[in-house]
Amino acid sequence: MSQATATQAKGIQLSDAALKHLLALKEQQGKDLCLRVGVRQGGCSGMSYMMDFEEPNRATEHDEVFDYEGFQIICDRKSLLYLYGLMLDYSNALIGGGFQFTNPNANQTCGCGKSFGV
């Protein structure tokens, strides 16, 4: 796993590799964007991770905003109950590459790593 950029005080941790990749994706879009992270019902294990870029002004009073060297992650408080302590990492490996979620709240995860159960 890559070195963490975030401090333990942040509810969602972000590795240096994930931050670097997110900044590159943001630059490709050519506008100011942040990453919204959340959960929804579904997936092999009961809950699925959600990630998408959005404009920072879309954050509401029901969201928590985490700043990583000028890049923001937004998470609604309900999802944060399931994601608190999550480590988001990135690997460019040919097999098993992409974003990887390490969730301390998950009692079970599926083989693909994109869903979990609590």
From Swiss-Prot:
Pfam families named among the record's database cross-references: Fe-S_biosyn (PF01521)
Family annotation (Gene3D superfamilies): HesB-like domain
GO cellular component terms attached to this protein's record: cytoplasm
Highest taxon of the lineage: Bacteria
Any GO BP annotation: iron-sulfur cluster assembly
SUPFAM superfamilies, A to Z: HesB-like domain
Entry's transmembrane regions: none
InterPro entries: FeS_biogenesis (IPR000361), FeS_cluster_insertion (IPR016092), FeS_cluster_insertion_CS (IPR017870), HesB-like_dom_sf (IPR035903), ISCA_plant_cyanobact (IPR031108)
GO molecular function: 2 iron, 2 sulfur cluster binding; identical protein binding; iron ion binding
UniProt cross-references to PANTHER family, sorted A to Z: IRON-SULFUR ASSEMBLY PROTEIN ISCA, CHLOROPLASTIC (PTHR47265:SF1)
Family classification: Belongs to the HesB/IscA family. Ycf83 subfamily.
NCBIfam families: iron-sulfur cluster assembly accessory protein
Protein's recorded name: Uncharacterized protein slr1417
